[in-house]
């Protein structure tokens, strides 16, 4: 009775949630002062539990901030230490457990947190939980209820907690909004305490024992859950696994200077590949050497930096026509960069997304770690590298190049065991080359901007008729093709869909032309290049873009790149400054819709200068292709039918409008 009656004079709140959910910022908002460390970071900001309090309207409010207590990558010792500290700070009771979730970022980690709360605090705790959503500002004009309805796992979680939730904007500068959201939360807490007949009583011994059981269970099942890299990798290194194939083919990949050749020599147990420190790449071509290991033939293929090669597929096929059993990405500890990611992108472009299932990461220069723990270093150093390790299911090894004798042999054996295990898990199959798909580039825009000349520049030959005329030169869609950097490229030149002279006489011509445009595209990914003339953005350009959106859908710009012709008119200026300083709102709006993707052509260029600007465009297209999940504008039969319906409805509307204007005149 005394505990319940004191709830009017004191409220104790426990913040729970995954890393970066906004717990600390929420705690600061509740207390009305900055007491918990809060900043955006890819690593955990809060390392230990912290208790702070403040008197708000004659009521003491106690807030306990916590690190991510239920993270699947945290070690068991840290979990146990933090949960014990949390329980000590929470005693004797809590008026509410606040589960903090960031709007738009509900993930499996949040579900793990909810499950962890029940495991540690027991089923009774569910009756005392309130969900606090953060990042209210990200909702914009949308309703929180609508957002919850659209996310089934989140909707189920809200139902599990009987619809108890509120939302915070921790970025607001409005004092009224700050106090309003805090008071709303505290009213919900008071109501919850009254409904439950009192607060949640913390039994340190019971909860601590329950958590220890949870830790023990996790430790016994670490093969089924994502643990730290070392724990995860140990389960697949046993030498007694099914021997499977009698040969292992390993392709060494990595940026220039990563130490691929030295790694190959360590695996082979002899100096087979040339090594040396040089500003230039020591390995200029693919080289293959082999050794016998546990009655298997192990072929090691040393490769130059494949991100700089034009025809990687033909080069690799000379040595392994079917593809390798394993990719070994060699990268020095502490030096994982964008150059490594360029190598991965090249592999993905040639082998597809599945190549991650065939990759192991070899970290060299382990000797530079000194006394540091490798797992700790990986967790706390490079986010991109750690993410890659997780994507590869924690398959990695580390080499100490100062190792000799038995130690050198041991680290080579451990790596080969991992490779053997991975190959066995992949059914002893090779990672086969990705089926080459054509890249379709559709040139669109008003007439007179230089679409045909741009098409000829991309193709490197005079395929499309291009000359200065008062009337549109291109009457119908046509295509040309070339091979660029081993990639088949089809360029489709189109008429201006809003300036077709014969459409007025025969409205069906527009429908026919859209069909023809799409039929020129071959099997593969399709992207648009919106062509404008530098310094001459007109009302016709605006109309042309509006027409394209009406035909291909409002989101077609997601698959589009802006291209300005007459680059020579820039003189000593650059395109970035031109766009930045443009006072044309319509042009800037299109630029934003196209994701700020833009380039410029001088269609009078020839030779290497012409190829340089073509490379710049196709690089942007392939970057966009990668961003869009290796898929372009959908021209499936279903989508084509939808487009034709759009065209028919648009033609009918234009016809009615024309008749109406005629009547009014």
From Swiss-Prot:
Sequence segments annotated as region (G3): 65-68
Compositional bias segments (type: Basic and acidic residues): 222-233
Keyword Mitochondrion: yes
Primary localisation category: endoplasmic reticulum
Record region (G2): 44-48
GO molecular function ontology, one term from the record: GTP binding
Region (G5): 169-171
Sequence ranges assigned to domain AIG1-type G in this UniProt record: 8-210, 245-435, 436-644
Biased composition (Polar residues): 234-246
Location within or outside the cell: Endoplasmic reticulum; Golgi apparatus; Mitochondrion; Cytoplasm, Cytosol
BP-aspect Gene Ontology terms: regulation of T cell apoptotic process
Chain positions covered by the region annotation G4: 134-137
Key words, A-Z: Coiled coil, Cytoplasm, Endoplasmic reticulum, Golgi apparatus, GTP-binding, Mitochondrion, Nucleotide-binding, Repeat
Binding site for GTP: 17-25, 38, 135-137, 170
Coiled coil: 400-427, 608-657
A GO term from the CC aspect: mitochondrion
Purpose of the protein: Exerts an anti-apoptotic effect in the immune system and is involved in responses to infections.
Family recorded in the similarity comment: Belongs to the TRAFAC class TrmE-Era-EngA-EngB-Septin-like GTPase superfamily. AIG1/Toc34/Toc159-like paraseptin GTPase family. IAN subfamily.
Record's protein name: GTPase IMAP family member 8
């Amino acid at each position: 009775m005394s505990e319940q009656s004191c709830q009017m004079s004191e409220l104790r709140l426990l913040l729970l949630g995954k890393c970066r959910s906004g717990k600390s910022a929420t705690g600061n908002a509740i207390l009305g002062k900055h007491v918990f460390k809060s900043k955006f970071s890819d690593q955990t900001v809060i390392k230990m539990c912290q208790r702070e309090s403040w008197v708000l309207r004659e009521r003491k409010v106690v807030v306990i901030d916590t690190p991510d207590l239920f993270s699947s990558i945290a070690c068991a010792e840290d979990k146990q230490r933090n949960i014990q500290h949390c329980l000590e700070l929470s005693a004797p009771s809590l008026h509410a457990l606040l589960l903090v979730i960031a709007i738009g970022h509900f993930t499996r980690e949040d579900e793990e947190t909810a499950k962890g709360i029940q495991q540690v605090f027991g089923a009774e705790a569910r009756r005392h939980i309130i969900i606090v959503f953060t990042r209210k500002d990200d909702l914009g004009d949308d309703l929180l209820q609508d957002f919850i309805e659209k996310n089934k796992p989140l909707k189920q979680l809200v139902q599990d907690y009987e619809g108890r939730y509120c939302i915070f904007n921790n970025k607001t500068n409005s004092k009224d909004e700050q106090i309003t959201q805090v008071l709303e939360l505290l009213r919900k807490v008071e109501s919850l305490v009254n409904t439950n007949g009192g607060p949640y009583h913390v039994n340190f011994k019971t909860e601590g024992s329950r958590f220890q059981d949870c830790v023990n269970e996790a430790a016994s099942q670490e093969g089924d859950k994502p643990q730290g890299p070392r724990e995860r990798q140990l389960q697949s290194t046993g030498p007694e696994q099914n021997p499977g194939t009698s040969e292992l083919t390993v392709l060494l990949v990595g940026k220039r200077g990563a130490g691929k050749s030295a790694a190959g020599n360590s695996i082979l147990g002899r100096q087979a590949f040339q090594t040396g420190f040089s500003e230039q790449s020591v390995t200029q071509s693919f080289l293959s050497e082999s050794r016998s290991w546990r009655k298997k033939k192990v072929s090691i293929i040393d490769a130059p930096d494949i991100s700089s090669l034009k025809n990687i597929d033909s080069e690799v096929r000379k040595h392994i026509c079917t593809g390798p059993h394993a990719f070994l990405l060699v990268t020095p500890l502490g030096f994982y960069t964008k150059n490594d990611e360029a190598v991965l992108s090249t592999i993905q472009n040639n082998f597809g997304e599945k190549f991650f299932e065939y990759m192991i990461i070899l970290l060299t220069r382990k000797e530079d770690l000194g006394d540091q723990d490798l797992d700790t270093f990986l967790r706390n150093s490079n986010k991109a590298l750690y993410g890659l390790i997780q994507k590869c299911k924690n398959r990695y090894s580390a080499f100490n190049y100062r190792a000799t004798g038995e130690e050198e042999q041991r680290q080579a054996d451990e790596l080969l065991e991992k490779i053997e295990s991975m190959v066995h898990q992949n059914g002893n199959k090779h990672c086969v080359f990705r089926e080459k798909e054509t890249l379709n580039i559709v040139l669109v825009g008003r007439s007179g901007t230089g679409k045909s000349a741009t098409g000829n520049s991309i193709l490197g030959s005079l395929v499309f008729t291009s000359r200065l005329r008062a009337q549109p030169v291109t009457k119908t869609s046509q295509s040309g093709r070339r091979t660029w950097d081993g990639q088949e490229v089809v360029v489709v030149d189109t008429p201006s869909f809003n300036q077709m002279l014969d459409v007025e006489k025969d409205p069906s011509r527009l429908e026919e032309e859209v069909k023809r445009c799409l039929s020129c595209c071959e099997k593969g990914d399709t992207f648009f290049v919106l062509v404008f003339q530098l310094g001459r953005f007109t009302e016709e350009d605006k109309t042309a873009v509006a027409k394209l959106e009406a035909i291909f859908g409002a989101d077609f710009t997601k698959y589009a790149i802006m291209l300005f012709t007459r680059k020579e008119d820039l003189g000593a200026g650059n395109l970035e400054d031109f766009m930045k300083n443009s006072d044309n709102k319509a042009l800037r709006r299109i630029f934003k819709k196209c994701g700020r993707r833009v380039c410029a052509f001088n269609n009078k260029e020839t030779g290497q200068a012409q190829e340089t600007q073509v490379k710049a465009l196709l690089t942007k297209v392939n970057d966009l292709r990668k961003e869009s999940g290796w898929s372009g504008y959908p021209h499936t039969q279903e989508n084509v039918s939808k487009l034709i319906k759009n065209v028919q409805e648009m033609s009918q509307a234009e016809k009615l409008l024309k008749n109406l204007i005629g009547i009014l005149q």
